[in-house]
Structure formats: structure tokens, C-alpha cells
């Protein structure tokens, strides 16, 4: 089995090195890394101290802003690099550089071999929800989330002001997409997923050939958690929802505001 790990990194190079070493299986895994354009690549690589050769640092780098379409751009760049490599992968994971596996490689391989056709990706229909908070994320226009300013405090103020203003401005979007004569509801998911190689190629081909995706998600809230879910919902492959047990391990401590999530 061939596995590709697509990793978005922006900080903590030593942890990224540990993550890649933990997931590496000789002859089975390749790694594609996008490093935020604001970070010095050579310095980061030196500190990561990755001693294996099956790691590709992609050259198409973007400045990533949380909640902006820039997240979709680096996701697309990683997918493109993986596909254009010419390697045929059975499975492709998308991870953050701050993740770490809680399963052994043997358990990961065993699960994937036992579920060869399962696409592991979250998706909750928010087009048909009655939750106004969720509807605002897709019906309101979210401008300036990728504004190229380095002052994070100022950027947060601008985003917050625009987001508040758009609640009251009577210019709204449909909470769904129409493409190829079909209505596609918007699904809220996660930036982390694991899909088959064929599924990844379908997603990529749809993204580069159909401009409707960028037109809609460019001004949506946290589009990186929705775009790929919605592309899959127009595919011919039937999707079914399954949730077995907990998806994370949480450890709450009295001294912490938020729990640690693994």
C-alpha cells in the first residue's frame, strides 16, 4: 500500500520532524509539506532535521490566514504536487504539522486495508440548518480574511468589524451552490481527511475545471473546512455517514481554559 501525507506547517519544525519520522514506513509512505510563505524555508528545514529522502517541500507557497481562502490555496497546491508527482497512491491523508498519531503504523495500515473504499471525511449539512450562526458562515460575505497585513491585532479588528457589518447589510448569498444543473448543499467538515487516490484525483480535476467552487468559497467563512466535502457530494460515488466512537481524546485540567485534544 502506498500512502501520501499532505502536511500544512507554519511553526514548530522539531515537532514536524517527529511527526514525519513517526508516520514513515519505508517503501510505503511519501510526505508533501507546505510551509507558510512567511517562514524562512532553509531555517525551518534545518531545525526540523528530517533525515529521510521521501519528503517533498512544495515550492508553491502561500501566506495562510486562518479562516480565509488562502487555506484552500495551499490545500490545492499540496494536492497538485501529490498528483503531478506521478506516484499512484492508495491513500492520501491531509494533516497539520502540529498533529501526531495515536495509532501505530501497523494499526493504520490494517484499518486502511480492511476498508479499501472508505472515504474518511467529515460533513454536516448546514444549508438546511436552522442555526443562524452556521447560516451566516455561508450566506454572508466574508471579506478581508486574507488581507496582506502583518499586524494580527489590526487584522482581527478589521475582520470583526466587517463580519459584524455584514450581519445587517441586506446583501446575502444563497446558502448552496448550483453546478452542472444540480443543487449542492454546503457541508461543514474538517481540514483533516483521508481519501483514496481516485477520490483525490476527482477532487483536483473538479477544482481546476469548475470555477464555481472558488467563486463561492472565496468569500465564505473557513472554506478549508467545507470545500472538499462539497466537491465530493456531487460525485457519482455514494456517500454514507458513519460515526463509530470518539474521534479525539480530551484531557481537561483545572488550570487550563481549554482541554488538550489529541
Where are these regions (language model features)?
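ER/Golgi luminal nucleotide-sugar-dependent glycosyltransferases, focusing on the catalytic module
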Residues: 1-262
Amino acid at each position: 500500500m502506498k500512502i501520501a501525507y499532505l502536511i500544512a506547517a507554519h511553526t514548530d519544525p522539531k515537532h514536524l520532524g517527529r511527526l514525519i519520522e513517526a508516520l514513515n514506513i519505508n517503501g510505503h509512505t511519501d510526505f508533501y509539506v507546505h510551509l507558510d510563505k512567511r517562514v524562512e524555508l532553509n531555517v525551518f528545514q534545518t531545525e526540523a532535521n528530517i533525515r529521510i529522502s521521501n519528503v517533498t517541500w512544495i515550492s508553491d507557497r502561500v501566506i495562510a490566514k486562518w479562516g480565509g481562502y488562502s487555506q484552500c490555496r495551499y490545500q490545492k497546491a499540496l494536492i497538485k504536487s501529490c498528483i503531478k508527482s506521478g506516484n499512484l497512491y492508495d491513500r492520501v491523508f491531509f494533516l497539520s504539522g502540529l498533529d501526531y498519531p495515536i495509532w501505530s503504523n501497523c494499526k493504520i495500515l490494517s484499518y486502511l486495508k480492511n476498508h479499501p473504499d472508505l472515504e474518511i471525511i467529515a460533513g454536516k449539512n448546514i444549508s438546511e440548518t436552522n442555526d443562524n450562526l452556521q447560516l451566516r458562515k455561508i450566506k454572508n460575505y466574508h471579506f478581508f480574511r486574507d488581507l496582506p497585513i502583518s499586524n494580527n491585532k489590526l487584522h482581527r479588528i478589521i475582520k470583526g468589524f466587517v463580519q459584524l457589518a455584514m450581519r445587517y447589510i441586506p446583501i446575502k448569498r444563497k446558502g448552496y451552490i448550483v453546478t452542472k444543473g444540480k443543487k449542492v448543499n454546503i457541508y461543514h467538515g474538517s481540514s483533516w481527511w483521508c481519501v483514496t487516490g481516485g477520490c483525490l484525483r476527482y477532487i483536483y480535476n473538479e477544482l481546476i475545471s469548475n470555477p464555481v467552487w472558488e467563486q463561492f468559497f472565496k468569500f465564505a467563512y473557513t472554506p478549508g473546512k467545507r470545500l472538499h466535502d462539497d466537491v465530493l457530494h456531487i460525485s457519482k460515488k455514494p456517500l454514507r455517514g458513519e460515526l463509530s466512537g470518539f474521534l479525539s481524546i480530551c484531557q481537561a485540567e483545572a488550570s487550563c481554559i481549554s482541554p488538550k485534544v489529541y
